[in-house]
Amino acid sequence: MIREEIKALIISSLAIALAFSIAMTGGIFGLINTKITNFLLLFAYSLFVISLAFILHELGHRATARKFGCYAEYKMWETGLIIAILLSFFGFVFAAPGAVVIYPRYDLWGRPIPLSKKKSGIISISGAIMNIFLSILFLGLSIIYPLELFNLASKINAWLAIFNLIPFPPLDGFKVFAWDKRIWLIAMISAIFLYFFV
């Protein structure tokens, strides 16, 4: 099971990195005019920054859910990956590579024990918290080593946190907002601050 999950994460990461690389060149027309060496460099960059942000986001959900006694596993959505790559040829990416599927614990009679609103909210916010942490980490690195790579990595992670905290289903922000509006607001303001004002 772990081997399948790792395989799904690797495939998802490669597909997302490819989609972002194509979109960042300007889509199909930009891709035609881009040197193969430049594209490979961009792909390597995307693989590092975007895949790291995506994998740690998903593992944040997974680890928190398992801490609450649930079974959690990342499931790849093949259709979402194909859509992401196809849309990248038009210059933009809508990435829906998959999600961590959570199965609740069962009681002695085999009945599922539903997650409380608080636990569900904590599991949901853990992915965004991971991205906020990475954004701060890369921001610190960009101050010490002023490389565009670190600066952009900080912004990408902040953007992922903002996007996932939007309080509409099926995004994580919906469950966080339902659990605790103050915590949702603090997380959202932190992510927006990192993206726009740093």
List the predicted regions and their residue ranges.
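Hydrophobic transmembrane alpha-helices and their immediate loop junctions
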Residues: M1-V198
